[in-house]
């Protein structure tokens, strides 16, 4: 709430209308104009797939966004950007066109290469919610029949502590196969992933080092697969090592 209080009455607060916690914060006191996005009753909302959707302003369709980014989280980011731009005088159709020309940043579903029909991506996702939104976005883009292989390392401090390990099966629901790099962990990753089934031929596997991890993925991958490597670090150069192994 301190952050809300620092915004002057002449300012604008752009808030995710889907988050009840934010609504509670604003309810404790707000002296600025608020623009909401995301929910159907918000000032700015979306109808359609995250890669191609109509933008509604106060319930009326005013523009359409077609871009390369996937996932509901990116759709919400787009609405937030449109709302902020609208506040400073940018017409919504102009903002939507700018998003159509937007080139995504590095390490956000960045395609590192394709070999033998197998695509390898790099993504910065490093906690369960980020893993889930990344994989959900790819699943929505590819459809139900494509195979997604999630390769990840719990590298952030909270993940190393195991504070969110119970959420990993939920985070990986949209992955056909999951491979976890376990170096440096003080908790049992195989136990945390047990609901998925762990071991050779199962839905999930664990690896104590990068060499083992690359070998596991190489043996499992097939033409047409999409491999998503997720970490907030360098991940031992696993992306390039996978591309070499798969070639």
Enumerate the language-model features and the residues they cover.
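Flexible active-site lid/hinge loop adjacent to a nucleotide/diphosphate
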Residues: 1-27, 68, 128-132
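Internal, well-ordered alpha-helical segments in soluble enzyme and binding-protein domains
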Residues: 3, 21, 74-80
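Short, hydrophobic beta-strand segments that form beta-sheet elements in well-ordered domains
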Residues: 12-17, 33-38, 178-180
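Extended acidic/charged loop-beta regions that coordinate divalent cations
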Residues: 20-64, 105-112
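ATP-dependent carboxylate-amine ligase
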Residues: 30-33, 60-61, 70-73, 79-247
């Amino acid at each position: 709430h301190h952050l809300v209080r620092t915004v002057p009455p002449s300012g604008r607060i752009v808030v995710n209308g889907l988050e009840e916690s934010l609504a509670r914060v604003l309810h404790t006191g707000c002296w600025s104009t608020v623009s909401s996005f995301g929910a159907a009753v918000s000032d700015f909302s979306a109808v359609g797939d995250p890669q191609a959707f109509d933008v509604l302003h106060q319930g009326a369709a005013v523009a359409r966004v077609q871009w390369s980014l996937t996932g509901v989280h990116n759709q919400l980011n787009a609405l937030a950007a449109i709302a902020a731009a609208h506040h400073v005088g940018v017409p919504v159709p102009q903002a939507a066109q700018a998003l159509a020309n937007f080139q995504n940043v590095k390490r956000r579903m960045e395609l590192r290469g394709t070999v033998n029909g197998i695509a390898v991506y790099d993504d910065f996702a490093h906690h369960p919610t980020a893993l889930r939104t990344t994989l959900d976005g790819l699943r929505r883009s590819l459809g139900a029949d494509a195979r997604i292989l999630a390769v990840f390392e719990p590298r952030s401090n909270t993940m190393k502590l195991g504070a969110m390990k119970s959420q990993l099966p939920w985070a990986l629901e949209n992955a056909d196969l999951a491979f976890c790099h376990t170096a440096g962990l003080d908790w049992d990753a195989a136990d945390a992933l047990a609901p998925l089934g762990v071991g050779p031929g199962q839905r999930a596997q664990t690896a104590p080092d990068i060499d083992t991890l690359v070998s596991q993925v190489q043996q499992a991958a097939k033409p047409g697969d999409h491999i998503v490597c997720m970490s907030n670090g360098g991940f031992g150069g696993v992306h390039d090592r996978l591309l070499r192994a798969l070639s």
